[in-house]
Swiss-Prot record:
GO terms for biological process: protein urmylation; tRNA thio-modification; tRNA wobble uridine modification. There is a cross-link at residue 120 (Glycyl lysine isopeptide (Gly-Lys) (interchain with K-? in acceptor proteins)). Belongs to the URM1 family. It comes from Aspergillus oryzae (strain ATCC 42149 / RIB 40) (Yellow koji mold). Pfam families: Urm1 (PF09138). GO terms for cellular component: cytosol. Keywords: Cytoplasm, Isopeptide bond, tRNA processing, Ubl conjugation pathway. This is Ubiquitin-related modifier 1. SUPFAM superfamilies: MoaD/ThiS (SSF54285). InterPro entries: Beta-grasp_dom_sf, Mopterin_synth/thiamin_S_b, Urm1.
Length: 120
């Protein structure tokens, strides 16, 4: 099951460049923090108010504020990054190969978060 989530206007202001859709998946128990749904289709602005593209860092903040229904943010994030023990894949590649949280999202990217602490 896929959940479609539109951008909250208060999170970022879309520019005239349209929107950007990515697929986000949660496994290894993380889906419990996101309404027990593994796959989410997320629409973000293609350009942010500063003119840049949304990054994984922006996506993390967006997910916590707009998609995560569980109040236990600390199970997913530690400060401004994912918790240790959560593997992040960008289009099936380890995010460390792509620049981690600085990676700029592209149309149709598939971002997967796997908790290795829960059998991931």
């Amino acid at each position: 099951m896929t959940t479609d989530t539109e951008i909250n206007p208060e999170s970022a202001r879309p520019e005239a460049h349209g929107s950007l859709s990515v697929t986000v998946e949660f496994t290894g128990g993380l889906e419990m923090l996101f309404s027990n749904e593994r796959k989410h289709s997320v629409t973000l602005p293609a350009r942010l108010s500063d003119g840049g593209r949304p990054s994984i860092s922006f996506l993390l903040e967006y997910l916590v504020k707009n998609v995560m229904k569980d109040e236990r943010k600390e199970l997913f994030m530690l400060e401004d990054n994912v918790r240790p023990g959560i593997l992040v894949l960008i289009n099936d590649a380890d995010w460390e190969l792509e620049g981690e949280e600085k990676y700029e999202l592209q149309p149709a990217d598939n971002i997967v978060f796997v908790s290795t602490l829960h059998g991931g």
